Each structure stands twice: as C-alpha cells, then as structure tokens.
Amino acid sequence: MALYELTNLLSIDDLTNEQILNLIKRAIDIKENNNQIKRDDLYVANLFFENSTRTKMSFVVAQNKLGLKSIDFEVSTSSVNKGETLYDTCKTLEMIGVNMLVIRHSQKQYYKELENLEIPIINGGDGSGEHPTQCLLDLMTIYEKFKSFEGLKIAIVGDIKNSRVAKSNYKALTKLGAIVHFVAPDKFKDDEFNNYKEFDEIINEIDVCMLLRVQHERHESQDKTQEFINIYHQQHGLSLPRYNKLKENAIVMHPAPVNRGVEIDTTLVESDKSVIFLQMKNGMFMRQAVLEYIIAENNL
C-alpha cells in the first residue's frame, strides 16, 4: 500500500473538523486520565533534518509513554552525508522494520518525494510549508480556555512569510469558525493572505494573541542587527503597554523558541495571560493522541 493510500498527517488539511475536535478531546482525556494505549511492538523513527527541541523531544516522550520503540535518526552520522536521498533513507528504514516516520525537513512538501513508501508519515514541519502537530497543540490550548472556536478573534503576529505555524493555524482556525487577522512588517508578509491589520488597531479586540518567532536563520543579515530588533519590538512586539490593552480573558501564545525582547517583552513570557509553556506541555499529550490516531487508522 503506497504512502497516499495510508493515513498520514502531512497537512492540517488531512483532517476534518470532526477529526480535529476528536484529537483535541482525546489529548485532553490523556492529559486528565493518563489512559493512553500501550504498544511495545512498533518502531517509530524520528528524522529531524532541521533543529528542534520541543517537537522532537515531545514526540520522543509521547512515543515512550505509549510504549513505542523510539529510534533517534542522527543526520550527522547517517549516509545522508554520503549523498543518500531522503527517499532512499526512508525506504531503508521501512525495509528494516520501522513502522512509522516522524520527519522534519527544510524542503517544503518533502513528502511528495516519498509516495512509494509503504509506512505512514507524521510531518514534524516542512520548511515554510506546514506544521500540523504544532497547529493541533495550539488548537488544544485554545479549546481548553474557550471551549469553542466559533467567533474567536485571533491575531497571528510576526514572520508570516517564513512561518509554517501561521499557515497551518490559519487553515484550521478559519475552518473551525474563528476570525483570523495577520500583523507583520511588509517584508514579513505573505502574499497568500490579505487580511493584515496594524497591531495597535486590534490589540484590545482579540481573544488570542499568537506571536511568531522572527526566523533569523531564513533572513538577510540586516534583519539580525540590534537596530532592526529594536524597531521590530517597538512596532510588532508584545510590549507591556500593548499587553495591558488585551481583553481580561485573552491569552498570549508563541510556538517557541522565543526571542525574548523581540516578539515579546521578557517579563511577559510567564505572565498571567501567557500560555506559552502550557502549549509545550500540551504538545506531548497531543502528539500521543496523533500517534494513537495514526496507529489505529492504519491498523498497525
């Protein structure tokens, strides 16, 4: 059975609204009752071709809590450095008995090269494409607070052009009934979207302030200067004055890693409205739910 005949999680578009809500409720159930399935007969390989702390480690912890045998693929010591293709690497893992892959890669839609694989893939982030499990943990965190998405006003603020998080979250949130606006400097805007606002124009109206990391590694050198950082924080960062204009029950989110003093004042990272570290905690529970879903749907 080829890849696209399997149930994968490559894009948030792979899930219906019902499936998204079921995953949220299952993740909350695992969080509250510690009742995850146990499967010690399956092997999962984690292939991270880009740096990661939260996504990679939460997948590893989630896999261990499910009893899965977690394999850490070391790019630096693999045959990738001898010129082996991504397909050949993944096909090798399939042939030696790996049952599932979690992949992060700098290439957008890298999975299109893997259509002849016969094991399912969970996308851990594809360049500036999508990040479906980050999206799901964000949705879980919002749902825990508001119990619904319908009519919520959400601002996604920052490096829209380079953000896979922005793209996945916009798709899912609008599909679920939320009203999403973008806030960004002109050079960080993505022409795919047209619903841009000024931060100060909507700061007192939004329920969710979703900040994005300025992805310095994807930018030109002038975007890394202290002058740029100061201007960015002044115009598009969550400063204390802006924070004080938020609605009483609003929440502040960030997929992390956080550039303190750039996207958000360092004193606000663990403020009352911030759920940044809760997002990280929820990520492990959501990834358990996703792993369960992939196992069940593919009869592994």
From Swiss-Prot:
Q: Which residues bind carbamoyl phosphate?
A: 54-55, 104, 131, 134, 256-257
User: Gene3D superfamilies, from UniProt?
Assistant: Aspartate/ornithine carbamoyltransferase (3.40.50.1370)
- Superkingdom field: Bacteria
Q: Which reaction does it catalyse?
A: carbamoyl phosphate + L-aspartate = N-carbamoyl-L-aspartate + phosphate + H(+)
Q: What is the residue range of the signal peptide feature?
A: none
Q: Which Pfam families match?
A: OTCace (PF00185), OTCace_N (PF02729)
Listed GO biological process terms: 'de novo' pyrimidine nucleobase biosynthetic process; 'de novo' UMP biosynthetic process; amino acid metabolic process
Task: Name its pathway.
Answer: Pyrimidine metabolism; UMP biosynthesis via de novo pathway; (S)-dihydroorotate from bicarbonate: step 2/3
GO cellular-component term (any): cytosol
EC number(s) recorded for this UniProt protein = 2.1.3.2
| GO terms for MF | amino acid binding; aspartate carbamoyltransferase activity
Q: What class of enzyme is it?
A: transferase
Binding-site positions, L-aspartate:
82, 164, 213
Keyword field = Pyrimidine biosynthesis, Transferase
Role:
Catalyzes the condensation of carbamoyl phosphate and aspartate to form carbamoyl aspartate and inorganic phosphate, the committed step in the de novo pyrimidine nucleotide biosynthesis pathway.
Q: What subunit structure does UniProt give?
A: Heterododecamer (2C3:3R2) of six catalytic PyrB chains organized as two trimers (C3), and six regulatory PyrI chains organized as three dimers (R2).
For this chain, the family text in UniProt reads: Belongs to the aspartate/ornithine carbamoyltransferase superfamily. ATCase family.
Instruction: Give the matching HAMAP family.
Output: Asp_carb_tr
Q: Can you say what this protein is called?
A: Aspartate carbamoyltransferase catalytic subunit
- In the UniProt record, the gene name given for this protein reads pyrB
